[in-house]
Swiss-Prot record:
It catalyses: a quinone + NADH + 5 H(+)(in) = a quinol + NAD(+) + 4 H(+)(out). The chain crosses the membrane at residues 8-28, 35-55, 89-109, 115-135, 138-158, 178-198, 214-234, 253-273, 285-305, 313-333, 336-356, 377-397, 418-438, 465-485, 511-531, 577-597, 629-649. It is an enzyme of class 7 (translocase). The keyword Translocase applies. It is a multi-pass membrane protein. It is found in: Cell membrane. The keyword Transmembrane helix applies. It holds the Pfam family Proton_antipo_M. It comes from the Bacteria. Gene3D superfamilies: 1.20.5.2700. One of its GO terms (biological process) is ATP synthesis coupled electron transport. GO terms for molecular function: NADH dehydrogenase (ubiquinone) activity; quinone binding. This is NADH-quinone oxidoreductase subunit L.
Length: 653
């Protein structure tokens, strides 16, 4: 009973905090509002830790049916809380990272008049994510799924007077509606063919659905899994539907940390892992997920190399790491996908918040305009370095364990995407070193006053990052231990499912494959150092500068070819331009045609035209009503003459 109450409190506390601060304390007592927001999140994190320890040591599953929600004939759905090992680890990630972001925001948003509204939105975001991961049915999960989408819209567009923020919020919301439409169709298909939305019932019928063919090569389950995976592709910003993620950087930096590390983008990975019982019986969709994930991790990493905005580089890094997680799910290594999700949450939040400290200090996003901040911000530099090395996958940091496990799984499965993953690992090291060198080690390009006043952030912003540093160090070792438990899928043995034919013999992976990711990362570090040292002649080509003396050694014809690839990467493979040309402009043209049809034809000859005729006759009637007796006498005489003439004409003919 105690654990059940704790489980309820974990989810309810962020909601209560959001409601109290948003509705009551926003304009009354801001100090009390801050205390409530932070204390409620810390309590939620503490209770999550208790539940996690219980799930780890005892293996206990908590299932609470709170109230009946939908009842229609034989179709019943309860509003419930379901906590197993997968949910408990997600609770830890969401509540701990969210708590850090809340505390950090007190310093980062200290001078913002809307800070209480901001904290209210953050708490609401946390609540919906907790609802999503604790659901025991697809309809309740969908409520959390849409909830985080709405909150992302509110937070990305938090500075609503900023036009770019409004556009970014709309872009994120609309892009996710595209994938969510497929997700809704998937849930509807599940309900139609299974008669239930509860996980347990749906998972038990997976094998039967896989044998129910609707096309020659496709089963009902294939269609369901494909629709669900499209929903996950949009939410987790995979290639094609990734375009909203970089623009989400228009919101405050703490929002970026929360969206990219612990909440919205991880929802897609969580759903694929939760539905492993379905996806395992749909090998064709698993192959599709593997390809999407592999392409995304390489595609996003290549774009990150040529970006200049520090937050957008980290955003594309997130997109790339999510590709790794998708690839892991595609090769049935769901445990390594969740493992990387956990480790990534800590070091990516650390990177974003450290970047926020830099931006807060120098009020600049362009890394080519920074430089030599190591002496001004040594603590921030240390935090950023730890986060970057964890991202690259250097031992003994957490990324070494989780990313390598994914690549080992891809190799063991025989997937060609292993090559993509290894290449992306090298690119990850290159763009990580790019940030470190240009922001902290390069020659400063900041104005003298700005550089002299650069400083470490307040303790409110710095101290919470200690938790993320600890997570970046120790979550990898702890996770590796939990996954090494003598059970299928290790710690997640009751949450995840693998068919025997898809189990990966990772223990038999050659040693050189195990060491290859870190070796490639080290090579990438060396390349990054070489590329971004000012003395090298091709540095200017890569940084979009024009220094003729340094490019004279390259033939002019070849120089344009060399710049061709960087220009493609700098423009993000022209995805935005292609979508604008193929989708946005045609929709605008179609909308204009509908406008013409509605305003110029239907309204003109319909209600507006009829109204004009009425107005004309009304005006004519008004002219007749002059008020003079001689005019009325003339009308009467004229009418009598016309009437007599009519009868005379009729009698004659």
């Amino acid at each position: 009973m105690i654990h059940q109450n704790l489980a309820i409190m974990i989810i309810i506390l962020p909601l209560v905090s959001s409601v109290i601060n948003g509705l009551f304390l926003n304009r009354i007592d801001k100090k009390l509002a801050k205390i409530i927001a932070i204390s409620f999140l810390l309590l939620s994190a503490l209770f999550s830790l208790i539940i996690f320890c219980d799930a780890t040591l005892v293996g206990k599953i908590i299932h609470i049916k709170l109230l009946p929600w939908i009842e229609f004939r034989n179709f019943k759905v309860n509003w419930s809380i379901y906590i197993d090992q997968l949910t408990s680890i997600m609770f830890i990630v969401v509540t701990f990272v969210s708590s850090v972001v809340h505390i950090y925001s007190l310093g980062y948003m200290a001078n913002d008049k809307g800070i209480i509204r901001f904290l209210s939105f953050l708490s609401l975001f946390t609540f919906f994510m907790l609802m999503l991961v604790s659901a025991d049915n697809f309809l309740q999960l969908f409520c959390g799924w849409e909830g985080v989408g709405v909150c992302s819209y509110l937070l990305i567009g938090f500075w609503y007077s900023k036009e770019s923020a409004n556009k970014a919020a709309m872009k994120a919301f609309i892009t996710n509606r595209v994938s969510d439409f497929a997700f809704i169709l998937g849930i509807i298909t599940i309900i139609i063919y299974n008669g239930s939305a509860n996980y347990k019932d749906v998972f038990l019928s997976a094998k039967l659905l896989s044998n129910t063919k609707i096309l020659v090569h496709f089963s009902i389950l294939d269609i369901i899994c494909l629709l669900l995976s499209i929903g996950c592709i949009g939410k987790s910003a995979q290639i094609g539907l990734h375009v909203w993620l970089p623009d989400a950087m228009e919101g405050p930096t703490p929002v970026s940390a929360l969206i990219h590390a612990a909440t919205m983008v991880t929802a897609g990975i969580f759903l694929v892992a939760r539905c492993s019982y379905l996806f395992e019986y749909s090998p064709i969709v698993l192959q599709f997920i593997t390809i999407i994930g592999g392409i995304t991790c390489l595609f996003a990493a290549s774009i990150a190399i040529m970006q200049s905005d520090i937050k957008k580089i980290i955003a594309y890094s997130t997109c790339s790491q999510l590709g790794y997680m998708f690839m892991a799910c595609g090769v049935s290594s769901y445990n390594s996908a969740i493992f990387h999700l956990v480790t990534h949450a800590f070091f990516k939040a650390l990177l974003f918040l450290s970047a926020g400290s830099v931006i807060h200090s120098v009020n600049e996003h362009n890394i080519f305009k920074m430089g030599n901040l190591i002496n001004k911000m040594p603590i921030t530099y240390g935090n950023f370095l730890i986060g970057s090395l964890a991202l690259i996958g250097i031992y003994p940091l957490s990324g070494f364990y989780s990313k390598d496990l994914i690549l080992e799984a891809a190799y063991s499965s025989g997937s060609f995407m292993f090559i993509f993953g290894i290449t992306a690992a090298m690119l990850t090291a290159i763009y990580s070193m790019k940030i470190i060198i240009l922001v902290f080690h390069g020659k400063t390009k900041l104005e003298k006053d700005v550089f002299e006043h650069a400083h470490e952030p307040t303790k409110t912003m710095n101290n919470p990052l200690i938790l993320l540093v600890a997570g970046s160090f120790f979550s990898g070792m702890l996770g590796y231990y939990l996954l090494s438990m003598n059970k299928p899928n290790g710690y997640f043995h009751e949450s995840l499912f693998n068919l025997h034919i898809y189990k990966l013999l990772i223990n038999h992976t050659p040693l050189y494959i195990k060491l290859l990711p870190m070796a490639v990362g080290i090579v990438g570090i060396v390349i990054g150092i070489c590329l971004y040292k000012d003395s090298l002649p091709y540095h200017d080509a890569l940084t979009n500068k024009s220094n003729k003396s340094k490019k004279d050694w390259i033939p002019q014809s070849n120089y344009k070819m060399i710049l061709f690839i960087p220009n493609i990467l700098r423009n993000k493979y022209y995805f935005d331009e292609i979508y604008n040309y193929l989708i946005i402009k045609p929709i605008h043209c179609l909308a204009y045609l509908f406008y013409l049809g509605d305003q110029k034809i239907i309204d003109r000859f319909g209600p507006n035209g009829f109204a004009r005729v009425i107005n004309y006759f009304c005006a004519l009637t008004c002219k007749i009503q002059t008020g003079y007796i001689f005019n009325y006498a003339l009308y009467i005489v004229s009418f009598i003459v016309i009437t007599i003439s009519y009868f005379v004409w009729k009698s004659i003919y």
